[in-house]
Amino acid sequence: MMTKYILAISGNDIFSGGGLSADLATYTVNGLKGFVAVSCLTAVTEKGFEVFPVDGDIFGQQLDSLADIDFSAIKLGLLPNVEVAEKALTFIKEQKGIPVVLDPVLVCKENHDLEVSALRDELIRFFPYVTIITPNLTEAQLLTQKTIESLEDMKEAAQMLHSMGAQNVVVKGGNRFRKDRALDVFYDGQHFQVLDCPVLDKNNTGAGCTFASSIASQLVLGKTVQEAVSEAKAFVYQAIEHSDDYGVKQNYER
C-alpha cells in the first residue's frame, strides 16, 4: 500500500515563491506528508539573485538520512551542479517502483555555458529512471539542441526527448506562441495532448515547481500520468489566479 510520504529534492527560494516552499505547500494541499532534501540556497546580494549549491557531502548526508523512508513519489527540482545531480541520481536509482517527476531546471543566469552543458548531459542520464519530465521551452531547446518556434516544434521536441529515454514528457510553452493562451504539450510515446488555458496577468513565480509537485501528488493519489498532468495544469491555473507579490498560492480558498 502506498504511503502518503512524498519527497522533494529542490532548492530554497528565499522569497518562498518557488522551490521547496511551493513543493511542500502543494503536497499539504493534497493531503500528503512532504519531505525535503535541500539542493541549494538563494539570496539577493550585490550581484543580484544568487544560487548557492549545498555542499555535495552535506547533500549526500541528507539523502542518506531519508533512505529508509517509504516514499510514494519523488519530485526533482533545481539541481545546481553535476555533483549534486549525481548524488540525486544515485538515490533515485535505489527508489524502485515509485513515480519520479523531473523538472529539469537548466536556466540559471549564474551558470556559465560549460556548466549548463555538463548539467544538461547529467540530467539526460535521469531520463530512464523517472516517470515524466517537465521542461519549459528554453530547457527543452537546451536538452534537444533544437530551436522551438511553433506548436509543431514543441511536439517534435517532446518526441525527441522521449527517444532520448524519457517515458513521458510535458513541454511547457506558456504564452510563447499565443499571447492569450498558455499551451503545453504532453506526449507518452504514442499520443499527444495539448493542454490549453487562458493566460493570467498575475505573478507566476513558482508555477513550474507547483506543476511538477502537483503531478507527483496526483500520481500518489492514484491518477494515471495523463490524468495527473491535466489535474496539475488546472491546479496551477488556480494557484496563479490567487498569487500574491511573491508567487503562486497553492492553499487558496476553494
Predicted features, each with a name:
Residues Q141-L142, D201-V225:
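Short, small-residue alpha-helix embedded
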Residues S10-F15, F192-T205:
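Short pre-catalytic strand/loop immediately N-terminal to key active-site residues, enriched for Gly-Thr
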Residues G31-K33, F192, Q218-A232:
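Phosphate-handling active-site elements
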Residues M2-A8, L20-V107, R254:
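Conserved N-terminal subdomain of the carbohydrate kinase-like
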Residues P53, Q226-R254:
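Charged C-terminal helix
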Residues F15-L24, C209-A212:
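Short glycine/serine/threonine-rich phosphate/pyrophosphate-binding segments
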Residues G77, F91-A118, R125, Y129-L137, ...:
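Juxtamembrane transmembrane-helix boundary motif
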Residues V116-H191:
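Conserved phosphate/ATP/ADP-binding segment of small-molecule kinases
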